[in-house]
Amino acid sequence: FCLSRGLGDVYKRQPIVEIEAISKMLKFAKDVDCPVELVHVSSWEAMELAKKAKAEGQHVLVETCPHYLLLDESYVEKYGAYAKCNPALRKKEDVERLWDYVKDGTVDFIGSDHSPFLKSEKEKLDKDGKKDIFLSPSGFPGIDLRLPLMVTEGLKRGVSLERIVELLSVNPAKCFNIFPQKGTISAGADGDLVIVDMNREVICHAEDSYSQAKDISKVFEGWKFICGVYATVVRGRVVYENGKVDESAAGWGQFVKPVRK
């Protein structure tokens, strides 16, 4: 499956490209006194630029994703296009170093960069009928794995549950100006809750996912989680419980309007 070409995609998306782009963005934002959000930050050098800008008083928000904290470029060799993403996965030493910026507060929140595609899209063929990673779209599913991945791997590395809640819930709500309607358990806030069983070990299997893109969910297959989501509550209504989605809740979602400041 074009594994030999897999690293070609990684090599053409080197960290220097990300570093240069973020350096320019921070300069432009500073010149016009504009807040800026840096998403999917994958290299420690780029993180260092953001950390320095914050220390100098710039309004900078930083997001990264579980796969940049946990997967290195060897996964592209192993899974080919199924591990292709933008920015590309980095070297192992880069991956572990990113956790320093999670711990010191440089990273404001963790996204999923959930990118669902059909298997036929991921396995694009070239003119000779061969699968070609360069024709495959970038990204893979991850929205349902963000919480168990961050709890499991974060606790291993000394990140507290309180900090994980900030990264996954509180800070995203603040970033998009929907706090305190979202992102907090308090009077007047929406009754949005995730009930997590911390005594339940779960093995990640794509076939258990509710995502329609589970056919391309390969990179975390077989990973062990120290917790499992028991229930999800949206505006006071239980929409998921003990492995089952309440299909009658379809349409229960509402547009969340940001508060303009």
Question: What residue spans do the PLM features occupy?
Answer:
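C-terminal cap of metal-dependent C-N hydrolases
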Residues: 124-132, 190-255
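His/Asp/Glu-enriched, well-ordered alpha-helical/loop segment
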Residues: 12-24, 28-33, 82, 109-110, ...
